């Protein structure tokens, strides 16, 4: 059986892993998943990520906690296969009043909502993280 929405699966694995206080979570790897993991690391929501080069590459994300509590409060899929959400440069949302980030897929690749606003670009809103 094929997976319908691999990005939603990735976000759910992160959410469930932190709820269960796991050190890390593993999932099938893909270029978009690696790009999202890179952004989460740059923004300080995860400790690290690694890709195991095997017959079926696996992405392992090391989760981050602060004083025993998960750093990620909410992680939510916005644009999905059945309903794509596109926003222009002036319509990009501020997650939690600017405390969180929205990951946006633009013509120049994935970037945060802040970076997209600075570059004057809009795109598909992949997810919200706070």
Curated annotation (Swiss-Prot):
Entry superkingdom: Bacteria
Keyword Calcium on entry: no
Record key words, sorted: Ribonucleoprotein, Ribosomal protein, RNA-binding, rRNA-binding
Source lineage: Bacteria, Pseudomonadati, Pseudomonadota, Gammaproteobacteria, Alteromonadales
Subunit structure: Part of the 30S ribosomal subunit. Contacts proteins S5 and S12.
MF-aspect GO terms: rRNA binding; structural constituent of ribosome
Name of protein: Small ribosomal subunit protein uS8
Any single GO CC term annotated in Swiss-Prot or TrEMBL for this entry: ribonucleoprotein complex
Similarity remark: Belongs to the universal ribosomal protein uS8 family.
Organism name: Shewanella pealeana (strain ATCC 700345 / ANG-SQ1)
rRNA-binding recorded as keyword: yes
GO biological process assignments: translation
A Pfam family it matches: Ribosomal_S8
Function: One of the primary rRNA binding proteins, it binds directly to 16S rRNA central domain where it helps coordinate assembly of the platform of the 30S subunit.
